[in-house]
Amino acid sequence: MVEKQTDSVGIVEAKTVRVVEVDNPLKLVSGKTLAPIDVTYETYGTLNSAGDNIVFICHALSGSAHAAGFSSEDDKKPGWWDIMIGPGKAIDTNKYYVICSNFLGSCSGTTGPSSINPQTGKAYNLDFPLITIADMVKVQKLLLDKLGVKQLLSVIGGSMGGMQVLQWAIEYPDFVKSAIVIAATPRLGPQAIAFDAVGRNAILADMESGRPTRKGLATARMIGHITYLSKESMREKFGRELKSAEKYSYDFSAEFAVETYLDYQGQSFVDRFDANCYLYITKAMDYFDLERDYGSLRQAFAKTKSRFLIVSFTSDWLFTPAHSEEMVNALVAQRKPVSYCNILSPYGHDAFLLEPETLGRLLSGFLSTTFAKPKFDKPAAVSSIRGVDRAIRLRVDYELIESLIRPNSRVLDVGCGDGLLLLNLQHDKNIDAEGIEVDQELVLQSVDSGLDIIHRDIERGLEHYPDGSFDYAVLSQTLQTLKNPHLVFAELLRVAEKVIVSFPNFAYWKCRAGLFFAGRAPRTKQLPFRWYDTPNIHFLSLRDFEDFCREIGAKVEVRLPLIGNRQSPVKFAPNIFAEQAIYLTSRK
């Protein structure tokens, strides 16, 4: 019996609609045709009067249209993403109208290998035509056309669902306002294809009368499930523990806990999934390759109009963070709006199903700010602009940086913290803002504010940004923490017309006095750290920075030596009496 839950969509009814009639078959990428095609889907929430609150969910390999809620009063297990979809949840059904459909080729209501072939009156089985991700998305579009949907607020999907999201954004740029791609890849690499091939071979080697039996599918599922887990999660969950005994049995039974776990996953899977569908779906994944289809990844994204959120997980070794960063780099190169976060997680590829708090915050903030522009209230001061920077940053610092930036400019803030400077600039100067930040928590805050933020260490470079991408780049209180400031600064001068830099002055008289009289590493209000916990690794003065600019061929256009919260620059002996400084620089 389903208990009433305030955060559940409750009991939902799956619906099936015909999107392709017998007399008008759909032409597939392979050149084959298919008809008829039925699609099963579920909806949650309420469509608003403007019809602009629709979120479409794309499920992964073994998923279905049943993403949230319960199928009946007696249903004990909610939908596969119930943890994310519902009233007050990340995908809030009090705000959004959510649609999830079973994709083409699956076995949960939509036409696939287990469906009846109208020409034979029997299941298609291996007579079903080969399909691709593009075919699946085309059928999803036919469904939404049938439902009268004019535009999607967002398309969201994890793993194989993320591949569908990419196809959506590329093929229907005017239809998709935003795209959320989670734990996905622009193409399967040879390792992933190899795992799929072994799984298919296990199924095809276990055929009786032309039909696969349960054993092959169970083995394929076990192989696949290994790729969904991380080494850390397997070690933590299983280690080398035995199932029930303390000693080895010295036979071929399942003794280790991890063996029994995989046995359970395999056996439970065959009770709800069709082996032929598994063959077709994994082959469709193998065929997915945006570079092959569009010439290059950059070219694939050339015509997209969506706002993108790309999410990866640190321990995912199936579709690694490098795969996600490759997509981010291509979007950046095409100057498309994109946010990226690499979530710290021990759960491997399955983390998109197991990290509701962090992933939920990302989705909630991104969706909310895509749906409606957030209201910005200017704070009086800033405290902790970086996770490692406990120094109090007074608003005067931001106001002076703002004064150096023209209205309607394109600005990149490197080490942007919680994004407050960019938000101020958006509010006051109507800038086009982008940020880069290494701290995960601050990335979450920035996305929640509606900014386009990339989760990355700036020292890895900006090579994917074209020359002159920005009018201004801002490096605020970060220069002294960089391992290679020369490389970073040179890159900033390449991608931006002007670079604004602020940093603490380590030649400030209190620093000198502390070192001279106390014989200890100096500490001031601007530099509150002890020697062992400071993020600062370079101890530069105003003179040092100006020498540095001359060496690399940078022109100093404006110098603002500052002390405390005074807006007026220090004029007398600034290298001694300035606590910090702001510089506006450019290429000579």
Which residues fall in each region the model found?
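Alpha/beta-hydrolase-fold enzymes
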Residues: 175-176, 181-268
